Regions:
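Small/aliphatic-rich secondary-structure junction motif
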Residues: 1-54, 149-216, 243, 301, ...
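Gly/Ser-rich helix-loop-strand patches that form or flank binding pockets
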Residues: 3, 96-148, 266-318
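Hydrophobic alpha-helical membrane-association signature
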Residues: 20, 64-67, 170, 174, ...
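General small-molecule cofactor/ligand-binding pocket signal
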Residues: 36-38, 82-86, 137, 190-192, ...
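Extreme N-terminal leader/targeting regions
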Residues: 40, 44-47, 51-65, 79-88, ...
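A short acidic, glycine-rich active-site loop
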Residues: 54-66, 213-229
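Conserved long hydrophobic alpha-helices within structured protein cores
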Residues: 102, 106, 142-157, 188-192, ...
């Protein structure tokens, strides 16, 4: 499946060929896509240096050009790459480039901690997750290549809710991307749907006339409804990505019961997942309501790379002008 045609890779000033750049080049080659490398530098206030602004700017540009040259040289035998240096707030300049050039994927390297706070998202990472209109792939520096295991997170939405169409579109995008990457990388493809029986805690509290048998029957009914929905979604996935691709990746489903922000990160750790594909939007069409509480909780608890997806009608609060 050739989904991506215009990829933007966010480089840093080191010039090191990171795993993220390997993935960017490989994906661009496989998709016959355009690949642009962008390096954003913050403006340095004049009062922080004794050098004239012009001399300092030239020194920094020369350093960044050398870093870009290393990346372009590494990839020269496989494809031609465009490169640019921009000055300003990095996330703003990256999102503006996406808007101006209609990018369909942003790839960036990130890093993790080793303690209880698993993710060490930079400020730029979080801004991109919240505000970039196209999918954002944040790649852990130690992620294996090729990717071994992918986890796609899908969510059930009440068909009568005003967000039902958006949820369906988002689920399709998530499954198509996960399926395509699993096919290309030869990865295991896992699909997770976390569910809860609303009202279970009250029913088990002993303060109602509902007995244990009725409670268990209710929970089982809810489980069957969610299982039926997930089964139907898999049938749709087969049509969306094609029977040949579907049979090649043979998705494995998981339906843990519990709070998604807890059970999804736990499952990702148990399965030793390398990449989580998930939606991040709480509401669409309203700038400012850009990332759901559950999504942010999941992002803060997982230890692997993330491909964050937003629906087509997402509206970024970033404008092309300051």
């Amino acid at each position: 499946m050739k989904r991506f045609k215009n990829i933007l890779y966010v480089a840093d000033s080191s010039g090191i060929v990171l795993k993220a750049f390997h993935h960017a080049v490989d994906l661009a080659v496989r998709n016959d896509a355009r690949l642009t490398v962008i390096l954003a530098m913050e403006r340095i206030p004049p009062y922080l240096t004794r050098l004239t602004p012009y001399l300092l700017q030239q020194a920094r540009i020369e350093e960044l050009e050398a870093a870009l040259d290393k990346l372009i040289e590494w990839a020269a035998s496989r494809m031609k790459i465009e490169a640019k240096i921009v000055e300003g707030k990095p996330f703003l300049e990256i999102v503006r480039d996406v808007l101006r050039n209609e990018r369909d994927l942003v790839i960036k390297s990130t890093d993790h901690g080793d303690g209880a706070m698993d993710w060490l998202f930079t400020s730029t990472d979080m801004h991109l997750l919240r505000k970039c209109p196209c999918p954002v792939w944040l790649i852990k520096a130690s992620e294996p290549a090729p990717i071994r295991r992918i986890l796609a997170c899908v969510d059930f939405n009440d068909p009568d809710s005003p967000d039902a169409a958006t949820a369906e579109t988002l689920n399709r995008m998530i499954l198509e991307m996960a399926g395509a990457l699993a096919d290309v990388q030869g990865s295991e493809c896992h699909i997770v749907h976390a569910w809860e029986a609303i009202g279970e805690q009250i029913m088990r509290s002993g303060h109602t006339a509902i007995d244990d048998e009725q409670t268990e029957a209710y929970i089982e009914q809810v489980r069957r409804e969610h299982q039926g929905w997930l089964d139907r979604l898999l049938s749709q996935m087969r049509r969306w990505i094609g029977a040949e691709t579907y049979d090649a990746v043979t998705p494995k489903t998981h339906m843990p019961k519990g709070n998604p922000s807890k059970v999804i990160p736990a499952l990702a750790r148990d399965l030793n997942i390398d990449l989580v594909v998930m939606g991040t939007v709480a509401r669409t069409g309203v700038p400012g309501f850009l990332i759901g509480n559950t999504a942010e909780s999941v992002l803060n608890r997982i230890r692997c790379s993330v491909l964050a997806v937003k629906p087509p009608d997402f509206v970024t609060p970033v404008s092309l002008e300051d």
